[in-house]
Amino acid sequence: MTNIRKTHPLMKIVNNAFIDLPAPSNISSWWNFGSLLGVCLILQILTGLFLAMHYTSDTMTAFSSVTHICRDVNYGWIIRYMHANGASMFFICLFMHVGRGLYYGSYTFLETWNIGVILLFTVMATAFVGYVLPWGQMSFWGATVITNLLSAIPYIGTNLVEWIWGGFSVDKATLTRFFAFHFILPFIIAALAMVHLLFLHETGSNNPTGIPSDADKIPFHPYYTIKDILGILLLILFLMLLVLFAPDLLGDPDNYTPANPLNTPPHIKPEWYFLFAYAILRSIPNKLGGVLALISSILILILMPLLHTSKQRSMMFRPFSQCLFWILVADLLTLTWIGGQPVEYPFIIIGQLASILYFFIILVLMPVTSTIENNLLKW
């Protein structure tokens, strides 16, 4: 008799994705982040669902309802902080996952990569609208500043902003629709993640060497299920350390002040995971130029397969490209730091130089270095 997991229509899908899936025998811990992102998403949907049971999306009561969750709801405080810090863990895993893709040349799986870039945009949109919901000072002013960027679009900009706001400023209508967006987007992310996996399983996983691994495959279960469980336990450990010992470490103190349209905070800045893009936006002293640079900083990922000039897929055996990659990582950390600093000397010039370097490394230095490496190997 054939095993039910191989015949049952539903279990067959699960079996082919998580049990009998042929996986390369040498994938490292950098390949753990896909499953960790799945766990983060499930965790965010569950904690978010319980928060939504007590949250009210009205300007008069939103801030109070979040306070009520923390003070009066059974274990509301832990649910709220798991959700807030879960977003940070989500982005840490995302950045690691994308970084892995860049380092090991996983972007040559075009469909998987492009869906991944769409996923990145969707997660960023979800995090942005979610940050507005507690209706603190930074929520309100963050929403005002970021939505206002759309007014840089010629001709239709102003109308577009007012249409998104549902009025002439960020107000009750804006908060209500942002809550609706924040509720629906995670389910869209889950659907996109399934498509992402579908395309990945068409080709099979990449591996650190970048060499096809068809000759050396092992079953996903038990080898990588146990490895993923270890990753998940570590993820939960780090998340709970953050939640229980330093829940406000990554937040902004201004968001504990209720939103006040008449009082602007001294430094308007987004959550830490958007600071690198915010620094690129601020480094251009022109509104439309800044918006284009902001979008380009993420959209540039779509160009990665076109910019790949090396005859090797992975960076594992390319020391010069490795150097450039880690300079790019350092540059992104610099941009993250600058994004949280006030707009004054010397931060302005550092931000501008770091922004130029970011685009210069990706668009010029990496393709040129890859070509030089090809020539050094007489390829």
Swiss-Prot record:
Keywords recorded for this protein, A-Z? Electron transport, Heme, Iron, Membrane, Metal-binding, Mitochondrion, Mitochondrion inner membrane, Respiratory chain, Transmembrane, Transmembrane helix, Transport, Ubiquinone
Entry GO terms, CC:
mitochondrial inner membrane; respiratory chain complex III
Cellular compartments annotated: Mitochondrion inner membrane
Where do the annotations place a ubiquinone binding? H201
Question: According to its record, how does it sit in the membrane?
Answer: Multi-pass membrane protein
The similarity annotation says: Belongs to the cytochrome b family.
The note filed under miscellaneous reads: Heme 1 (or BL or b562) is low-potential and absorbs at about 562 nm, and heme 2 (or BH or b566) is high-potential and absorbs at about 566 nm.
Name of this chain's protein: Cytochrome b
